[in-house]
Amino acid sequence: MREQDFLNHFLKKGYFKKHAKAVLALSGGLDSMFLFKVLSTYQKELEIELILAHVNHKQRIESDWEEKELRKLAAEAELPIYISNFSGEFSEARARNFRYDFFQEVMKKTGATALVTAHHADDQVETILMRLIRGTRLRYLSGIKEKQVVGEIEIIRPFLHFQKKDFPSIFHFEDTSNQENHYFRNRIRNSYLPELEKENPRFRDAILGIGNEILDYDLAIAELSNNIDVENLQQLFSYSESTQRVLLQTYLNRFPDLNLTKAQFAEVQQILKSKSQYRHPIKNGYELIKEYQQFQICKISPQADEKEDELVLHYQNQVAYQGYLFSFGLPLEGELIQQIPVSRETSIHIRHRKTGDVLIQNGHRKKLRRLFIDLKIPMEKRNSALIIEQFGEIVSILGIATNNLSKKTKNDIMNTVLYIEKIDR
């Protein structure tokens, strides 16, 4: 194939339409060197600014020499190159994580929004077969994604439709360790695939076909279930067990860096069915929050070391606090003004709940913890609820409950009003 054919494919797919700067992961192998040649030659046509990034894994004697040659190559092409050296105990997983962490650092430093890798169809076959042997979930058998958004960056794999044999023989570095069967991927490439191709010469095409078919099913299910609110458990549980599993898995597809194992997926299912309220860290910085008939999966938010100080409000004063306007003894106009009887004799304290808080109702003291459970108040709302306190006792839990003192006591003590208006809607 000609370089022009690859360029035409890139333009037709519109890989770089949304990107002005792209980082190329340059290993020095045939695939990445040819991708470098195409991208550097046709930067203007693709309308991108190319940046190179290389990781020296320090696993071979030749790696330092290769690093120097890549520096020369970048200088000749007048392109910036960033290089990092791997250290510590080597494994495929550690090396992969190190590479992607480094690439993200380079992107942040340069303002690039796309990471380009030279994965091709042969890599795709190996990946699908590896996952199948390891017993991965069905959705992961669709293989490597051609385009994948992770956070604020997009990973682009423009060679995924081409086999290695489609690339011309150009200057590159041969990694001799690829011939050794120490690593799983090498055993797949050097031993398992050749044996399977003896049974079916078109085995690679068959594997790619299965991957594409699974991807089609995933996309179709996502489209058909678009109007189903999976986070509403009443709605989710109205379907059969099989449909629930498929809908839940489709929902999890929204989080590309949350790759749950079968055991972790089963654990999530169990929590949704058995817990009324639960907060559970899952994986990769995500947590599951279950609140009665609703749940959500989100990134774990950093918690402040210290809670906000309580607010003290004096008579004949107003203050805006956490989305509300509080007016002590000064009437507010409007249809949605809350009014709470209070005393003018002392200041009002507005705060969040504390351990041991109680509210007097019908002459009985009730712990807030028990009150929240009885009223089925979600955990998030419990933590954000505003407590209005006077004379050392809770007068009201805003929007939830009020201290219902007897009429006689109210007439004696409650001689003014705290007016409250929601101002952050």
UniProtKB/Swiss-Prot annotation:
GO terms for biological process: tRNA modification. It is an enzyme of class 6 (ligase). Its EC number is 6.3.4.19. One of its GO terms (cellular component) is cytoplasm. It is found in: Cytoplasm. SUPFAM superfamilies: Adenine nucleotide alpha hydrolases-like, PheT/TilS domain. Keywords: ATP-binding, Cytoplasm, Ligase, Nucleotide-binding, tRNA processing. CDD domains: TilS_N. GO terms for molecular function: ATP binding; tRNA(Ile)-lysidine synthase activity. ATP binds at S27, G28, G29, L30, D31, S32. InterPro entries: Lysidine-tRNA-synth_C, Rossmann-like_a/b/a_fold, TilS/TtcA_N, tRNA_Ile_lys_synt, tRNA_Ile_lys_synt_N. It catalyses: cytidine(34) in tRNA(Ile2) + L-lysine + ATP = lysidine(34) in tRNA(Ile2) + AMP + diphosphate + H(+). It comes from the Bacteria. The N-terminal region contains the highly conserved SGGXDS motif, predicted to be a P-loop motif involved in ATP binding. Ligates lysine onto the cytidine present at position 34 of the AUA codon-specific tRNA(Ile) that contains the anticodon CAU, in an ATP-dependent manner. Cytidine is converted to lysidine, thus changing the amino acid specificity of the tRNA from methionine to isoleucine. Belongs to the tRNA(Ile)-lysidine synthase family. This is tRNA(Ile)-lysidine synthase. The gene is tilS.
